Amino acid sequence: MNKLRQSFRRKKDVYVPEASRPHQWQTDEEGVRTGKCSFPVKYLGHVEVDESRGMHICEDAVKRLKAERKFFKGFFGKTGKKAVKAVLWVSADGLRVVDEKTKDLIVDQTIEKVSFCAPDRNFDRAFSYICRDGTTRRWICHCFMAVKDTGERLSHAVGCAFAACLERKQKREKECGVTATFDASRTTFTREGSFRVTTATEQAEREEIMKQLQDAKKAETDKTVGPSVAPGNSAPSPSSPTSPTLDPTASLEMNNPHAIPRRHAPIEQLARQGSFRGFPALSQKMSPFKRQLSLRINELPSTMQRKTDFPIKNTVPEVEGEAESISSLCSQITSAFSTPCEDPFSSAPMTKPVTLVAPQSPVLQANGTDSALHVLTAKPASTALAPVAMPVRETNPWAHAPDAANKEIAAIHSGTEWGQSSGAASPGLFQAGHRRTPSEADRWLEEVSKSVRAQQPQASAAPLQPVLQPPPPAAIAPPAPPFQGHAFLTSQPVPVGVVPPLQPAFVSTQSYPVANGMPYPASNVPVVGITPSQMVANVFGTAGHPQATHPHQSPSLAKQQTFPQYETSSATTSPFFKPSAQHLNGSAAFNGVDNSGLVSGNRPAQVPPGTCPVDPFEAQWAALESKPKQRTNPSPTNPFSSDAQKAFEIEL
């Protein structure tokens, strides 16, 4: 019966060892290169392994997969885990496992990721390979059982795939110029180029380009008339009918015969975007990103470009002043640091101050008379710019019963002008009630001023006799303890014009009014021949002598000018004033006080016959010393308000 059964069974082929079948291996090598090599296999599965190479690693993986298959078969009976019947395709690009029935792609393995392949010594038909998983970056071993062939034939076919892949890689390196430089000292290597897998069309294009480059090389070596061979001398391959023809000279400029020129975008796409076209100055030498200095916002090229491209309309015209001498600057510094100011906020309560600023308003007239707020200039000027409006107070806490002296003090004399008003207080101003003792620099400056004054002749001012018209009373600003400014008259009358205020070349001294309306007149003691300590002693010794009356000054004594009294709370005053010229054609009173007590200014100076004209500085100093010493009303909050001081200047 056994023989009868064996007669119906399929007879097995006679076993021929692999070493005696070299003709089959040759066909496998050709099939791998053409991509037509395939083997029917049973895919056992894959497991994770610890190493990337070794036959023992592959054998252990096969044992594990076979043991799992037996375990499931015995536990579940016929429903155990079976090996999948599939077809293994081997090519120079990779290994692909396709299901025999469903034609599904089970495994698609790149040949470059395969690190090791080997047959199994325990199972003749077993074959496995180790690869690196692209997602988990772990070593995975895939195991197969060949159906018709042995594991050695499958391993040989995969080895042929390795060789074909290596040949392609070396060919690409030669074409695209991939170079690897190894540094033994740092145990590193640098690779240049790309190993990207190219398509058949790209490969044909590269072959054509290589032919053109070789032709151009031959033309250079032969030293023909033309520097290069014209493109298109080689017919394009049939597989690439649309292959572009490139100029070989452009490629030879790179000095690399193996380099393949890239396709570049058109010039329109390479142009810069619109956001950068607006600032062409960024590419110049003045770019802030090219210099090592500090970055200033106003000097940025983009800012300067915006200023030039979009000019600001309705700009305010600025008139530059005359150059100042060193002596005038010294006198201004001395005036700013030595002029005391009474504390106006401690003696009387104040209501809310209202500051009116009209920087570009035209000059107004009241009842046909020019405003008393004109700023006089020392040179002819036809353009009339706007004056600076004075701070206005609703109520005057210092307004008492007006008398003749107060009216004369409040009147605007010849040469009245305002300093330039700014949004912040001038740096030369001190806080109200601040006292300052002269320093060594002040004493040195006084000594230098004395020596200069002794050498230079005194400048005389020609008397001006303007006509004063009785103006209507106009309510302007109340008198308050001012920051005293000084002016200096020129020797010729000039028309009344208004220009931005200039700083004087010389600042003379002025009378100093206090809170009760009684001023300290300017000192008139000669300063030649006395020491600075004596000068300080004279000033501080006679500072407490008030003056009951203040006679009107004659135009012949026009060096001494009285300025309008304005608010100290507005913090917009400046102690520096420019030279004044002459009287206004109108006058005004403060707080509605009539100026009927003013004496007409067109009378000449009354000098007794037979006597020389007295210098106004000496006359006022003598008048100051002759008065009895009194104390002003002390402030309840300011302990220094009763000690009034008089600042003086030395005329150069």
Swiss-Prot record:
Concerning PTM, the database record says:
Phosphorylated on Ser-275 and Ser-294 by CaMK1. Isoform 1 and isoform 2 are ubiquitinated by LNX leading to their subsequent proteasomal degradation. Ubiquitinated; mediated by SIAH1 and leading to its subsequent proteasomal degradation.
Give start-end positions of Basic and acidic residues composition bias: 213-223
For this UniProt entry, what is the primary localization, expressed as one broad class?
Answer: membrane
Q: Which Gene Ontology terms describe the biological processes this protein takes part in? A: adherens junction organization; axonogenesis; cell differentiation; forebrain development; lateral ventricle development; negative regulation of protein localization to plasma membrane; nervous system development; neuroblast division in subventricular zone
Q: Which residues form a coiled coil?
A: none
Domain of life where this protein originates? Eukaryota
Phosphoserine found at: 194, 243, 275, 294, 426, 439, 635
Where is each PID domain found?
Answer: 37-173
Report the membrane topology from the UniProt record.
Peripheral membrane protein
Q: A single Gene Ontology molecular function, please?
A: cadherin binding
Per its UniProt record, what PANTHER family does this chain match? NUMB (PTHR47368), PROTEIN NUMB HOMOLOG (PTHR47368:SF5)
| Assembly and binders | Interacts with SIAH1. Interacts with LNX. Interacts with CDH1. Interacts with TFAP2A and TFAP2B. Interacts with RALBP1 in a complex also containing EPN1 and TFAP2A during interphase and mitosis. Interacts with AAK1. May interact with DUOXA1.
Q: What name does this protein carry?
A: Protein numb homolog
Which species?
Rattus norvegicus (Rat)
